[in-house]
Amino acid sequence: MELNLSGKEINEVVTSIDDILGPSEQRYFGEGYKRTQYECNINYDKDSAQGLVSVAYRTDWSQKKTQSRRPHLSTIDAFLIAGRVSYAIIKRHYKLSAHQSSQAWIRHVSIKAGAEALEDLDAVRLSAQLLDTSSSQDSLFGTLTRVKTKLDSMEIEVIIDHEAEADHSQSVVSFSDDDEYFNSDFRLRHCHLANNTFCDAICAVSSDLLFQCPGKPSTGAMGHYPNALMMVDWLTCFAQLSQLVMYRLDKLDRNETHNLWMRSVTVTTPYPIIPRRKHTLTLRSMKNSLVKKKGSSWRLATVNGSVSGHPEFNLTAKLCHQLPQGEPA
């Protein structure tokens, strides 16, 4: 489903998202996530994996009122870890060549958080299992494989579009999970949201995505598409649009807010998009409510996101955040 604001009353247009949320260098979904470090100690079996993951945030990962915030395991962390492990499992199962591994594409991601945000990040338990493989005519390479990863109480399902037949003319890729995208290349990409256009009547915002990347050759996962928008790009952009919508609902300044918690998120990206100068993203709150929890007021919302010109691309997420003290529910 493609959302747009055509024919709707526009309430406000803000040139740069930084003018609303603050400098991207001080925001997690701006540049802060790129400063996170991961140490993965994973053991692989036939179609599964288990181990421990350490996630280290710098103190300046996200700042509000010049103070650092306490981090929790984010959707970005969950995707990067689960994506890395899912690729490693599929490479082993199908004995993919280096070329086959680099052109395999992450088509779908679904992330569900536990009952509470996970803040103990020194030794997060990981388990992963290849669930199933199916043939698909509506895919790039004819085969879709689903892998489920658990990070403590968080669950992540990744669907990868890939070739099923081993390419014996090519050397089999190393079975390490040291793919450049998951380790370093995601940090080299830059997304900026401009011309942020608000329609309060339907709780929606549309923004132009301006994208820059080095386009350098990459080895391992999705290395065949160095200029394409990747899952982290989509997740961080839609997360920022979610912040715009959530804060506007209660007329909040980001400096006054608590961390935004994505309770669940599902993203479908069926093929690589090599971006034009810009793409228009739209996010809308389909429903929202205020509730009381342990004496505090919380805003809950369900949002849908879309990409102009690509109706097959979509995002659905359930979000919440605690309102500042004094805001009634």
Regions found by a protein language model. Give the residues of each.
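Non-catalytic linker/capping segments at the edges of enzyme domains
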Residues: 1-66, 159-229
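RNA-interacting cores
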Residues: 58, 68-71, 86, 169, ...
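DNA polymerase sliding clamps and clamp-related checkpoint/processivity subunits
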Residues: 65-77
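One face of beta-strands
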Residues: 78-81, 109, 237-241, 265, ...
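Hydrophobic beta-strand-centered segment that forms part of the acyl-chain substrate-binding groove
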Residues: 86-132, 244-286
